[in-house]
Structures are given as structure tokens and as C-alpha cells.
Amino acid sequence: MLNLISCELSKLKRSKMVLISVAGVLSTPLLMLIEALQTHFDKPEIIFTLSDIYSDSVLYIMLLVNMMIYVAIAAYLYSREYTENTLKTILPIPISRTKLLIGKFCTLLLWIVMLTLVTWAGIFIVCGLYHVVFTLEGYSLLVAISWLPKFLFGGILMFLTTSPFVFIAFKTKGFVAPVIASAVIVMGSVALSNQELGALYPWTATFFLIDGRIESTGYPLALAIGIIILVSAVGFFMTFHHFKKEDLK
């Protein structure tokens, strides 16, 4: 299994997709910097802290920018075997399809964790630049570190909810369909981000869970978590079932 993950990572070293994904998630820190500058000049009486910026960034990470990028890298990671026609050379080697999929899912998780860390560090760095020029209340590494577990947990939740898009990537053998599907899902997430029903929509429920808003919706926490797990499990099952039954021509 470690050899499979190592092989997947070595293939990514030669891919421009890694740099593209890093550049993509860095748009979140830049958006937070722009928002901070706008607040500073338009409403100078408002005092905000580093913790406030991290809190506001959760919306962009869980519902908008990062979620779409994570779906894109998931689609790329799985569809590339079809576009590059490498499955026929991989599967004759004594590697089961199940192990191959598990290796890819582990690689996807590592990639998402890496991008989540880049986002977290990027916010701290751009806030540092703001702090040097304007002074930011509560700017310290300890505050940033206190947000790291929440960011990583959010990354894991987003990894779980990418499984249906992985199935779409396998089913269509392409990159475009899962990305289009993610755009539709993101629009739904944004529409429900201020609605109580968002607790029942798995891609919004992950945001509510990280933001601590599940209880305020009136729905049980266990129900929201159960929906997230159910959608994730269905996505994983359909992916494994389809790939194991697929006839490679």
C-alpha cells in the first residue's frame, strides 16, 4: 500500500496540477486580505482580530474556493488513468483494484491535507503583512495554531464528501462532469448557508459543523453527521463497485 501511495505521489511530482491547486487555494488568503483592507479603509472603527479572519475564511474554504479545488484534484487523480490510458498497464501487475483505489484515496487525502495547510499558513502570512502595515489585533502564532485542528478537521470532512464526485469521474472517465457537478453543489451550498435546511445538505452541513451552527438550526447534531457519513459511504461504495465490475477494453 505504501508503494502505491509513493507511486501516486511520484506521478504528481511531474504534474502541473499540484502547482495549480496550490495557487488556487492561495486565493482564499488573498480574498481575506482584500476583505481586511476593505474593512480597514471603509469602516476604520471596526476592530477585527486574526481569529476573526480565520473564522470568516471557513466559509470560503468549506463552501466555495477550496471545495471546488478539492473536487477538481479528485477528478484529475482518478480520470487521468483513463485520459493517459495507463490502467491497462497498471492492472496486469499483481495489484488488486481495491488496493489501487485505496491508494488513490489515501493520496487524495494527503493532497487535501497539504492544501489545507497551505491555506492555513497563507492566511497567517498575509495577515502578517497586514499586521506590519496597519497592526492586527491578536496576531500571534498561538492563535493561528489554535485554528489548525479545525482546518484539518474541515479538510477531512471535505475529503469524505468528495467521494460522489470520484464516482462521477470514474463513470464518465473524464474531468469535466465532476467539476460541473461540483459547481452545482457549491451553488446549492451557498444558497443554504444561511438556511436551517443547510444542516440536512451534506456539503453545507460540513460548514455548519465546523462553524458550530448545527444546534442553532434545530436539527440534531447526530442527524447532520449521519447524512454526511451516508453520502460519503454511498460515494465510496459506488466507486469501488463500479471500478471492480468495469470491463477495461
Swiss-Prot record:
GO biological process, one term: response to antibiotic
Induction comment from the UniProt entry of this chain: Transcription is activated by the regulatory protein BcrR in the presence of bacitracin.
Keywords of this entry: Antibiotic resistance, Cell membrane, Membrane, Plasmid, Transmembrane, Transmembrane helix, Transport
Membrane spanning residue stretches: 17-37, 58-78, 108-128, 141-161, 174-194, 220-240
Keyword Secreted listed: no
Protein's name in the database: Bacitracin transport permease protein BcrB
Phenotype upon gene inactivation: Disruption mutant is sensitive to bacitracin.
Species name: Enterococcus faecalis (Streptococcus faecalis)
